[in-house]
Amino acid sequence: DSYGMYGYLCHYPAAVHAEGTWREVYDWETGRYTGRIPEAAQTYNVIGNINEHQVTIAETTFGGREELVNPEGIIDYGSLIYIALQRSKTAREAINVMTSLVEEYGYNSGGESFTIADPNEAWIMEMIGKGPEHKGAVWVAIRIPDDCISAHANQARIRQFPLKDKKNCLYSKDVIKFAREKGYF
C-alpha cells in the first residue's frame, strides 16, 4: 500500500486475565475509542501479524459499499486482526474468533479480504458490514488448496463459493439471505 505506512512492529505479550476483565477497543487507523469487550482468559504472544502458535493474519481493503459500514460497531478490521491473533491457536479458530466478535459487537469497517494461515492451512476470508441498521457482518472464507498460492490485490477475490463443502468453505449463516434482501443477488 505504502512504503512508509508500516513503520513499526507491534507487540502484545501473552497474558492471563482475571475473570471480569474488559478490553478497551480503539480503531486501528484513527485511535478513536469504539467500546469495550470482555477479555479472553488467556491471550497469546503476538509480534507484528503473527502469534506464538504461528497463526498469521494479513489484510487488504477492497472497500465495498459505503452503505454497509456501521459506525456504531465496536470492532474495526485492524482491531479484529490483533484480537484474533491474541486468542487463536489455528487459522480456523481465528476465523471463528473474528466472525464471533463482529457478530456480537458489530463491524465498523468497509470490505476487507483477510489471509489467515497457520503451519497446516491457509484461508482467504472476505467480510463486509451489514450497515447502520444491523450489527454483524456477512463473510465467506475459502481454504487455499495445499498446491496453490494466493496474493492480495486490494479487491474482493471470492466470486463463487461451494455452499456444500463445509471442510473448505465457511460462511455467515445469512450470506445469501442478506444479499437477496439488499437486492445484490
At which residue positions do the language-model features occur?
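A contiguous strand-loop segment
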Residues: 1-76, 97-185
